[in-house]
Amino acid sequence: MMELLSPAGGFDSLIAAVQTGADAVYMGFGAFNARRSAKNFTDEEFASAVSYCHLRGVRVFLTLNTLLTDRELAQAADALKKACAMGVDAILVQDWGLLTLAREIVPDVPLHASTQMSLFTLGGANEAA
């Protein structure tokens, strides 16, 4: 089955994606997503966006797709927990440390390898899976 996954850098683009048939949207909030130049979402806006999407049968993927330092890992984990409490359907991850941590703290939330994860071999893909 083919799925249309669209970016949502702010509420206007989220509404446009949903109204034009997106099956799912990916969006970030906070500092740990590769779309930092986009408007992105405050915590309150993110929660509203998740509700808006779910009421319309659209899934929401959180982008946590940047490389992290050891000092940033705890903050990124907090963002992950907060977004999962808001009802995100999946997480797009780049950093291997966050991938490992996410498997521990939100084991039931699907994780997706970001295109920035730099997986080039079958072995790397198997390790990420």
Predicted ranges, named:
Residues M1-A129:
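Non-catalytic helical/linker scaffolds that mediate oligomerization, partner binding
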